[in-house]
UniProtKB/Swiss-Prot annotation:
Main location: cytoplasm
HAMAP family membership: RhaA
UniProt keyword terms in alphabetical order: Cytoplasm, Isomerase, Manganese, Metal-binding, Rhamnose metabolism
Species whose genome carries this gene: Escherichia coli (strain 55989 / EAEC)
GO CC annotations, alphabetized: cytoplasm
Family named by the database record: Belongs to the rhamnose isomerase family.
Known catalytic reactions: L-rhamnopyranose = L-rhamnulose
Full protein name: L-rhamnose isomerase
Xref: InterPro entries: L-rhamnose_isomerase, Rhamnose_isomerase, Xyl_isomerase-like_sf
Length: 419
């Protein structure tokens, strides 16, 4: 430990102690909050089923930065490089299209065996795994409908895919000793004015009920459902709206997924957390950065990321909220994107843990809104960066922007060699 870092750490401890914060306890609590990194940042959501196929479902990965992962081995190596630069507990979030098989596998036939390499890798790296059925980029999703499709056989295909995905998810949880959160998102919707908005939602409701009909051990698997405002090609109508899934998660007591980019640009999910928690047992968060639409830019340490973290910490939702990331930027180094976004999420959690929440609650209850605002603003100037650097040091990860040197070296040695 450098003398400069030691000095900054000791001063930070004193400054935070003066406002009633135990920084050692804050770091212990931070280690209780894993962040689930999304595998698809590493290859622009290509997957291994049909890597040269086009990305559909109303989502886009823009850019053509060289060096994207072309297979599972490269993707895992890239993830390891990123994870070495991110302090604290982590998980990995997989989509079904990241299966591994020597022969083609229909999505309704995926099995745990197709993900055994991921499980062994997760064990070796002490990671939990999360999962998602992939209801996009497939011939049977080409007309914009999956679980709500009017064709019984196509709808059944997607039901069977989601049912198979749940078994894969339960396999993850059983093997790794930590429950896998499996999130269902579908792109179903219409581009223009829709006359019958009810029938697709009726079909989706029945389909989801069939999907979750098989009882699985909650210690291994958690169901989550995710809404969206619109997608490219589905601007006028989205079957799985916020109201639909809020009602579904409440009535079926599944987890509800809130994606930061899936609402109107003036809405924020930080304001939805406390409301949803009154009705659903658990929340899954997809922390992202929407720029004018669901653009999935890399997460910043901005006001909304901080507000999301603060909601989790202020209301002690550690055991009920699962923190995941969802962004994919193909215009910059993909490993750097992982590192920037994940470190920012963890920084926001640390800053929330360093807040004198008890004192702020007292001021709020007393109606002293002047002091509340004053303290909220003054705490932004407290030396949280020194605490963060100590956290990085203890987890053998770089402090400051030192990690960028490692990314550049990896790019030169590994990424630049890829075609």
């Amino acid at each position: 430990m450098t003398t400069q870092l030691e000095q900054a750490w000791e001063l930070a401890k004193q400054r935070f102690a003066a406002v009633g914060i135990d920084v050692e306890e804050a770091l212990r609590q931070l280690d209780r909050l894993p962040v689930s990194m999304h595998c698809w940042q590493g290859d622009d959501v290509s997957g291994f089923e049909n890597p040269e196929g086009s990305l559909t479902g109303g989502i886009q990965a823009t850019g053509n930065y060289p060096g994207k992962a072309r297979n599972a081995s490269e993707l895992r190596t890239d993830l390891e490089q990123a994870m070495r630069l991110i302090p604290g507990p982590k998980r990995l979030n997989l989509h079904a299209i990241y299966l591994e098989s020597d022969t083609p596998v229909s999505r309704d036939q995926i099995k745990p065996e197709h993900f055994k390499n991921w499980v062994e890798w997760a064990k070796a790296n002490q990671l939990g795994l999360d999962f998602n059925p992939s209801c996009f980029s497939h011939p049977l999703s080409a007309d914009g409908f999956t679980l709500s499709h009017a064709d019984d056989s196509i709808r059944q295909f997607w039901i069977d895919h989601c049912k198979a995905s749940r078994r894969v998810s339960a396999y993850f949880g059983e093997q790794l000793g930590t429950p896998s959160v499996m999130n269902i998102w579908i792109p179903d919707g219409m581009k223009d004015i829709t006359v019958d908005r009810l029938a697709p939602r009726q079909r989706l409701l029945a389909a989801l009920d069939e999907v979750i009909s098989e009882k699985l051990n909650p210690a291994h698997h958690i169901d989550a459902v995710e809404s969206k405002l619109f997608g490219i090609g589905a601007e006028s109508y989205t079957v799985g709206s916020n109201e639909f899934y809020m009602g579904y998660a409440t009535s079926r007591q599944t987890a509800l997924c809130l994606d930061a980019g899936h609402f109107h640009p003036t809405e924020v999910i930080s304001d939805k957390i406390s409301a949803a928690m009154l009705y659903v047992p658990q929340l899954l968060l997809h922390v992202s950065r929407p720029v004018r639409w669901d653009s999935d830019h890399v997460v910043l340490l901005d006001d909304e990321t901080q507000a999301i973290a603060s909601e989790i910490v202020r209301h002690d939702l550690f055991d009920r909220v699962h923190i995941g990331l969802d962004f994919f930027d193909a215009s910059i180094n993909r490993i750097a994107a992982w590192v920037i976004g994940t470190r920012n999420m963890k920084k926001a959690l640390l800053r929330a843990l360093l807040e004198p929440t008890a004192e702020l609650r007292k001021l709020e209850a007393a109606g002293d809104y002047t002091a509340r605002l004053a303290l909220l603003e003054e705490q932004k100037s407290l030396p949280w960066q020194a605490v963060w650097e100590m956290y990085c040091q203890r987890h053998d990860t770089p402090t400051g922007s030192e990690w960028l040197e490692s990314v550049r070296a990896y790019e030169k040695a590994i990424l630049s060699q890829r075609g």
